[in-house]
């Protein structure tokens, strides 16, 4: 591809793994970076539960409380349909979208580590404002500060993980971001469950967002930036020191550093206009397609709206407030367990196997929820659901969450973090994050209205999308397991379809210097 990098290979075009153990230093470094997902996960999990707390609703959304009191049979799907209530959740993602675009340039100019520090500070400020909110304006401002933190952290952390991790461990370590996101969701749901028992519990739930913010802020202060970022900013000596520390004995640090330096030299030749190159140049077509497709499909799995609104869905099918919150805790725990299992096998069996299995599970689950709600709640929401069927809805929702945790949960962060060449890596990640946040805003703002208008068909809608994305991944995604970042163009150039766009890397001996083409 134009602006690509020729890295050392073994003579048949395949990339060389420069080695590197799973050292204590790389584990600690990646744990701190991945903890950015903890804050995002906490914010994902907290808003849906808080939205079911009656003291919170009475203070900020009294119209919803009146609608709940006046609800008659036939209105179960529409009780929570409030644009103001969904704006409380979705405002975070408008701010995150804007911040992610700015963060692309900031990440390139100041480094990944500095952006994570900024993200932690913004998260802390947002948690403080929402925790002490006295009106809707303060709630929205606080959520927007949290959104700016999301935009910065989601831009920097996956890149940090992908660039720091040894090739053979890159999938598992990059998936750590989603693992911590799932941990954050579980912490949020447990917090909501216990906080709902006191009138001021909603303040506790919202304000505690500041706690994980302190973790990433202080942790990031002590991190060294990634070798790629240091080389891009002209500090090759620190880049070498960083590689020596995180790779350990036995790694060919000098060869890896040479590859990074050459990649950065190519990146500087086309430093400006990365977005324009992605859009205009034929050889960048695979990266452009996946920069759009990955975040779009990630959102259309339906897991985001389930994470936000599952307490409201559970109340819709007949559970009380506490039972609905406990159901959300169970969902978070299921997601976390499946993420742990996925992380253990992602670098053994590859990415595509996990996508296929997870996709099949999610389709079955969404169809099951649609069928039960259509048969038991009725087309107009006029029927009361028997408890066994309500439990089945929870079970199918857990199954969907399990499928997501096995596949798109970790891989939705792993794939975008590893497929882009260095000259468009920041731009590609910015596009991935901004599209994802933009679609999250659209979905969170529209889901309750969709549930009210399309009723059980909402879940069939998501099942259809999961079927589409599973076929797309099977056909168009090359397997990236075990491929060094600097050699990623090789797998695209050999793919049955993308080879007409991407270019094969010329063969060189392992000790030959690399160049550009």
Swiss-Prot record:
Extracellular side: 47-83, 142-143, 192-203, 310-325, 374-389, 452-456
Coiled-coil parts of chain: none
Cytoplasmic topological segments: 1-25, 105-120, 165-170, 225-288, 347-352, 411-430, 478-517
TM region positions: 26-46, 84-104, 121-141, 144-164, 171-191, 204-224, 289-309, 326-346, 353-373, 390-410, 431-451, 457-477
Entry similarity comment: Belongs to the major facilitator superfamily. Sugar transporter (TC 2.A.1.1) family.
Function: Mediates active uptake of hexoses by sugar:proton symport.
Record-given protein name: Sugar transport protein MST1
Gene name in the database record: MST1
């Amino acid at each position: 591809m134009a602006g690509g990098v020729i890295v050392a290979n073994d003579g048949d075009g395949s990339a060389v793994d420069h080695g590197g153990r799973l050292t204590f230093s790389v584990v600690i470094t990646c744990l701190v970076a991945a903890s950015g997902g903890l804050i995002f996960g906490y914010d994902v999990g907290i808003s849906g539960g808080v939205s079911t707390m009656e003291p919170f609703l009475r203070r900020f959304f009294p119209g919803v409380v009146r609608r709940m009191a006046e609800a008659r049979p036939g209105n179960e799907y529409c009780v929570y349909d409030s644009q103001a209530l969904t704006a409380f959740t979705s405002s975070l993602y408008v701010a995150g979208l804007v911040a992610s675009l700015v963060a692309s340039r900031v990440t390139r100019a100041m480094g990944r580590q500095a952006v994570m520090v900024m993200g932690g500070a913004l998260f802390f400020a947002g948690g403080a404002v929402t925790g002490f909110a006295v009106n809707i304006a303060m709630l929205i401002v606080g959520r927007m500060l949290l959104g700016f933190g999301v935009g910065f952290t989601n831009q920097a952390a996956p890149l940090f993980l992908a660039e720091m991790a040894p090739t053979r461990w890159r999938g598992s370590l990059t998936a750590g971001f989603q693992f911590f996101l799932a941990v954050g969701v579980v912490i949020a749901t447990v917090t909501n469950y216990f906080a709902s028992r006191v009138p001021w519990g909603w303040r506790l739930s919202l304000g505690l967002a500041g706690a994980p913010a302190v973790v990433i802020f202080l942790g990031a202060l002590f991190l060294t930036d990634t070798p790629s970022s240091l080389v891009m900013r002209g500090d090759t000596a620190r880049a070498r020191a960083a590689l020596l520390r995180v790779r350990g004995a036995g790694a060919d640090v000098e060869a890896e550093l040479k590859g990074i330096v050459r990649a950065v030299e190519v990146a500087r030749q086309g430093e400006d206009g990365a977005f324009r190159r992605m859009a205009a140049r034929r050889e960048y077509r695979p990266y452009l397609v996946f920069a759009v497709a990955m975040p779009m499909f990630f959102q259309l799995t339906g897991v985001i709206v389930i994470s936000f609104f599952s307490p409201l869905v559970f109340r819709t099918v007949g559970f009380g407030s506490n039972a609905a919150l406990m159901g959300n805790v169970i969902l978070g725990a299921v997601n976390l367990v499946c993420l742990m299992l996925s992380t253990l096998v992602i670098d053994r069996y590859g990415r595509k196997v996990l996508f296929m299995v997870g996709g099949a599970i999610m389709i079955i689950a969404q169809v099951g929820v649609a069928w039960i709600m259509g048969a038991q709640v009725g087309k107009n929401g006029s029927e009361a659901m028997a408890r066994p069927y309500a439990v089945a809805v929870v079970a199918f929702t857990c199954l969907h969450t399990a499928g997501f945790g096995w596949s798109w949960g970790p891989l939705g962060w792993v794939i975008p973090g590893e497929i882009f060449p260095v000259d468009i890596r920041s731009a590609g990640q910015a596009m991935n994050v901004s599209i994802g946040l933009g679609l999250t805003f659209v979905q969170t703002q529209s889901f309750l209205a969709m549930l009210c208008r399309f009723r059980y068909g909402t879940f069939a809608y998501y099942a259809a999308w999961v079927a589409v994305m599973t076929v797309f991944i099977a056909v168009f995604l090359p397997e990236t397991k075990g491929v060094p970042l600097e050699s990623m163009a090789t797998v695209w150039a050999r793919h049955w379809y993308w080879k007409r766009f991407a270019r094969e890397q010329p063969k060189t001996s392992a000790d030959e210097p690399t160049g550009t083409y």
